Structure formats: C-alpha cells, structure tokens
C-alpha cells in the first residue's frame, strides 16, 4: 500500500462531506458516507468532467455535466449520462481508492 496524505478532515467537513483532491496527478473524489470514507476517480468516464454531487442516501456520486451516476463503493456506473442513454455502463466504471483518516488528515491508497 502507498498511502498519500491529502487534505485535513476539517477541509472535508468544511466542504460538506465531499471534496476532490489531486494525488500524484490523479483527481480523486472523496466522500464521507454513512459507512465511512470513500474515494474514486473524480473524472467521469463519459466526458471527462469532474464528479461533484454526492448522494449519501444512495451512496452514489453524480457527474455535474450530464448526470451519469456511480456507486462510491464500487465505482460502477449505475445510471448513464443523459446525452448517451445507451452508453455501455459496464465499461464506464471508475477506479475506487481506499481512504483513511490518519491523525486528522485524509490519506488515499494509490496502489
């Protein structure tokens, strides 16, 4: 495992429980859900937009450009983009990352 320190837990709280961070050139979306911290690639696999709308009740994140929706625990696309309703969802998932709180800072396992 290669844990990389990102931002403080306070920054996540100040951002409403969701934040995008840059880790070694990868933009990672981090959200605090009902079952802990989750991280996934923050760049939508459809049009390369940054994800931005975390829905805690469904544990999903929505792309702000075209509405594609991804599970934060698996990265699986569960709703296609509105402009491409026939997109091959099984091929458009996102990489997930382990995230932890280490002494008040969020760390992401980049392996």
UniProtKB/Swiss-Prot annotation:
Cellular component annotations (GO), alphabetically ordered: cytoplasm
Coiled coil: none
Domain of life: Archaea
InterPro entries: Rieske_2Fe-2S, Rieske_2Fe-2S_sf, SDX-like
Keywords: 2Fe-2S, Cytoplasm, Electron transport, Iron, Iron-sulfur, Metal-binding, Oxidoreductase, Transport
Subcellular location, record wording: Cytoplasm
Transmembrane segments: none
Rieske domain span: 3-108
Cofactor descriptive note: Binds 1 [2Fe-2S] cluster per subunit.
Pfam families, A to Z: Rieske (PF00355)
Family statement: Belongs to the SDX family.
NCBIfam families given in the database record: SDX_Thmprot
Protein name according to UniProt: Probable sulredoxin
Species, as recorded: Thermoplasma acidophilum (strain ATCC 25905 / DSM 1728 / JCM 9062 / NBRC 15155 / AMRC-C165)
